């Protein structure tokens, strides 16, 4: 009986401690999210035009995870997992610069994880035009495709900078 009582007491104390911890963690999480919203905020947001994690927009026109620079965009307008890029100095996780974009494409000065170098329409997971570069940048010339597409001009940068035209998983314009 004594062990059963001890077990019940331990259970009560444990559940109380867990509840207190969870409420503190929840408050911290909420305040952290608010800080992030403030830090990453750009006009607009979500999956459309405007903000998201990058400049430009969400997964659609202009941005996504990188709008211009960062995880997917090159330099200039566009970015994200497949949005356009633009002219300029390129960089980020995948997009080069120039007309390309997406996870590897790009023209212009290119760079990053898979962005090519040189000119052309670029795009896709490793396409692009010109001299190629990075972990997936191709060579050749002409208008790529795949997850890439897009157009525009300007310079991007950083984890989220940049703006301009572009498209989501293949859209954009030349």
Curated annotation (Swiss-Prot):
It is found in: Vacuole. One of its GO terms (cellular component) is plant-type cell wall. InterPro entries: Merozoite_Surface_Assoc (IPR053329). Disruption phenotype: Reduced organ length (e.g. inflorescence axis and roots). The keyword Cytoplasm does not apply. Residues 1-22 form the signal peptide. It comes from the Eukaryota. Induction: Accumulates in response to flooding stress. Induced by salicylic acid (SA) and abscisic acid (ABA). Stimulated by 16-hydroxypalmitic acid (HPA), a major component of cutin. One of its GO terms (biological process) is response to salicylic acid. Its main location: other. This is Glycine-rich protein 5. It comes from Arabidopsis thaliana (Mouse-ear cress). The lineage of its organism: Eukaryota, Viridiplantae, Streptophyta, Embryophyta, Tracheophyta. The gene is GRP5.
């Amino acid at each position: 009986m004594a062990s059963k009582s001890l077990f019940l007491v331990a259970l009560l104390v444990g559940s109380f401690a867990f509840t207190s911890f969870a409420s503190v963690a929840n408050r911290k999480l909420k305040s952290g999210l608010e800080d992030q919203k403030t830090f990453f905020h750009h006009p607009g947001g979500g999956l459309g035009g405007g903000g998201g994690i990058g400049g430009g927009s969400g997964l659609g026109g202009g941005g996504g995870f990188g709008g211009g620079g960062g995880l997917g965009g090159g330099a200039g307008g566009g970015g994200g997992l497949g949005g356009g890029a633009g002219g300029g100095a390129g960089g980020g996780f995948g997009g080069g610069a120039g007309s390309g974009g997406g996870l590897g494409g790009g023209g212009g000065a290119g760079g990053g994880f898979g962005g090519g170098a040189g000119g052309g329409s670029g795009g896709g997971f490793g396409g692009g035009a010109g001299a190629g570069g990075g972990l997936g940048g191709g060579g050749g010339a002409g208008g790529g495709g795949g997850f890439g597409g897009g157009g525009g001009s300007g310079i991007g940068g950083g984890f989220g900078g940049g703006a301009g035209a572009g498209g989501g998983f293949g859209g954009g314009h030349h």
